[in-house]
């Protein structure tokens, strides 16, 4: 009987993306996780996990990273954290700003759309998992989502993207990342879309927080992964404490057997805690990583 130990190895609280170096084993299934140790008899494996918060690109950041020829370079934003994200076995970022490219027109608060160079910087910084379900995911419409996903698939296919999907078939695919023989299953959800509504028949494009869906997703993921990590876009902006809904959802996820919960959206740091599930399991909850 395999024993699984989950230990928080390194959590970064930064504004921006990151890149990586070295080889990281990836599979068509996908998953991610914090410094995780799995033990089966004398078999001990260490996997390091680094996570950062909301990568939200405001207008001033566009301005200061413009090259003057219509292109952008955001890589220097992450140069001081690359040593962490590139070294980690799995590095996670919440890509809050949708990056549908300049062809859709760049925009910032309150409705965002960024250039593809943001995604290049994320890749250069070494991220393996990009959460792409937030209240800003539909800011550039359906085309913004499709453009971002197409760019990631063509230029950065090794980065796992959760929470948004180009097709119904893709929305049903399980994502698992394998490191040191340990399979990390990953999921991501958002509380809403800032009043924007997905077209009828396209509801699959963004994973919204829905208990029935989450339960079904987690149950399927547990069959093909050793560790389950869920990204949750939730909470109250600029509040340093989790609200009751966050706590209730954390308990719900723990009861399902989820191992790690990564929270975003408040734009400030909130506490970390362990929640005990109904079967006595312990779930590490990071309520908010800030920006």
Language-model segments: what does each one mean?
Residues 1-22:
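Sec-dependent N-terminal signal peptides of Gram-positive bacterial secreted proteins and lipoproteins
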Residues 17-291:
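Acidic, metal/ion-coordinating pockets
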């Amino acid at each position: 009987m395999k024993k699984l130990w989950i230990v928080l190895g390194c959590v970064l609280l930064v504004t921006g993306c990151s890149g990586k170096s070295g080889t990281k084993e990836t599979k068509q299934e996908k998953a991610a996780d914090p410094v995780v140790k799995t033990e089966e008899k004398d078999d001990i494996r260490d996997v390091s996990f680094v996570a950062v918060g909301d990568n939200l690109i405001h207008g001033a950041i566009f301005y200061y990273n413009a090259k003057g020829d219509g292109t952008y370079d955001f890589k220097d934003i992450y140069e001081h954290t690359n040593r962490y994200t590139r070294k980690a076995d799995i590095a996670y970022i919440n890509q809050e700003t949708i990056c549908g490219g300049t062809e859709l027109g760049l925009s910032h608060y309150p409705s965002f759309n960024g250039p593809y160079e943001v995604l290049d910087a994320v890749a250069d910084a070494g991220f393996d998992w990009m959460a792409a379900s937030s209240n800003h995911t539909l800011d550039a419409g359906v085309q913004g989502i499709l453009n971002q996903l197409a760019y990631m698939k063509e230029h950065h296919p090794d980065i796992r993207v959760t929470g948004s999907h180009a097709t119904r078939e893709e929305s049903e695919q399980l994502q698992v990342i394998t490191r040191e023989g340990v399979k990390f299953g990953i999921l991501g959800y958002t509380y809403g879309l800032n009043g924007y509504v997905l077209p009828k028949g396209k509801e699959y494009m963004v994973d919204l927080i829905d208990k029935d869906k989450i339960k079904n997703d987690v149950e399927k993921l547990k069959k093909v992964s050793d560790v389950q990590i869920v990204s949750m876009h939730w909470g109250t902006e600029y509040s340093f404490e989790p609200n009751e809904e966050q706590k209730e959802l954390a308990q719900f996820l723990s009861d399902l057997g989820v191992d790690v919960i990564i929270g975003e959206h408040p734009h400030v740091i909130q506490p970390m805690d362990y929640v005990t599930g109904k079967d006595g399991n312990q779930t590490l909850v990071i309520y908010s990583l800030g920006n």
